[in-house]
């Protein structure tokens, strides 16, 4: 049987970075196996449904380059579906679930439960006081057929629960974790169908995975404790269970599960900050999977060729934003200046440095600006911090060293010569920037750091930074002269 895998998110909000990794691993395994990757929407919990979440998820996955073969898709501006195993939205499959629930009831592997919320709360409170594991106490498990009919005819609300056998070991093999065994004494009779007629995740996922011929279930480790119930459902229906892969959690630096309280966790957050899709995908692939060699830079095609489930880790991987920035910075440096300029323009507008008309009229100049900063940013939004030296009328002295350099005795001499050279120049380009320092050195006898460092501080306010000839080209004659005058005044005020 050919490989078929699925990513099955719930439309409850933003796409978590962990969800992107789950989708990515499913996609990569399908590609490596010449199989199919399906995207199914699990919206059985209608109380948590968020309008627009499906569309947002599809946009995030398209941005990341994680494309599915079957499932929910955009057809123009609206949602559609493609594939032969649909519907791919669970709320459109209610009749299918009812059919298979009737089979389960008929076989005696499920039962009606008429317990009220108040009774269930009392049971849980009693279990808590007595130090027992929380779970359903089986109150409705052995109702007679007549009692059930009477309650149904009276219109009593109900749910349908899984009837687990008593004291039975349920075993399954996980490709990452090996053999897993759990006894039904440690499980409770899970609700399979809610009172609103919607199935719970545990029932719908088994029916859907079977009918869609899913061969491998690749999902987060939070589903590991529920898997014995799913395995038992396959057994109850007489179906062959898929192979399971439970992925390790993505952790914060303190090794707790990645949380929005401690930083960005939504794919949209990274997109807005100007991370490149290839940078985020490359990095997130490495959080929980280790390649055979020490290489850390992988294109999507290289990931498709190298990925294997056998090299997925059991233990959680730490999300290291510094490592992400290093990987993403690599892709920024490898990108064309046009691409990064186009991505940078909204951030420069947001910072108030340029207007939309500036973006069109001064595009070539903006490309020059970006080319100066491109190898100094880890994500595109960072350009807002770095670009101020080209827009602010006054320099800002960043540290003690820059403040000391602005007071060196020979600085006025350097500024006098630099000012004269700039005023005499027909154009300030990179060639001018390279030649002017040789001329200043020749005329003043000042060279090396004593020449370059003070002038860099005058032009940028910083001791270190991009190549000075490039900086001068982007600043242009007026800005250079304005800064020289500003520093003249600054020197006078310090006396």
From Swiss-Prot:
One of its GO terms (cellular component) is cytoplasm. Its EC number is 6.1.1.17. CDD domains: GluRS_core (cd00808). It catalyses: tRNA(Glu) + L-glutamate + ATP = L-glutamyl-tRNA(Glu) + AMP + diphosphate. Keywords: Aminoacyl-tRNA synthetase, ATP-binding, Cytoplasm, Ligase, Nucleotide-binding, Protein biosynthesis. A motif ('HIGH' region) lies at residues 9-19. It is found in: Cytoplasm. ATP binds at residue 260. GO terms for molecular function: ATP binding; glutamate-tRNA ligase activity; tRNA binding; zinc ion binding. It is an enzyme of class 6 (ligase). Monomer. This is Glutamate--tRNA ligase. It comes from Alkaliphilus oremlandii (strain OhILAs) (Clostridium oremlandii (strain OhILAs)). The lineage of its organism: Bacteria, Bacillati, Bacillota, Clostridia, Peptostreptococcales.
